Amino acid sequence: MHFREPGLTHKGDISTESKAGLAGGVTSYFEMPNVNPTTTTNENLTKKFEIASKKSFSNYSFHLGGSNTNIEEIKKVDINQAAALKVFMGASTGEMLVDSIDALNDIFNYSPLIVVTHCEDPQRV
């Protein structure tokens, strides 16, 4: 799901979007890391869980976001906390585009989490 908290709450927040999901029968969500600031550190991941614990009306988890430079954050993520590691291989928010072969190799070799990817080719989309 693409909620917009923190940083982009004029588009929607955890409270409003989880209520909307419940109205449509969605009782659980894994939310994306491309917010502001991005969820590419364990500190920001923890902050999102803190926000959701106060505002969410349904079950939740969050993806840690991959980047070209955050392999050390990825290596130390609590596998019982994050749903997965989200990697954007096409255009994305902020520093979240992973276009370095070395970074991709590190992510796929060392991530303790399942890796989920956006693999679209921006020229074709």
Where would I find each of the regions flagged by the language model?
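Metal-associated gating/positioning segment near the N- to mid-region
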Residues: M1-K55
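Histidine/acidic-residue-rich, glycine-tolerant segments that coordinate divalent metal ions
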Residues: V35-T46, E50-V125
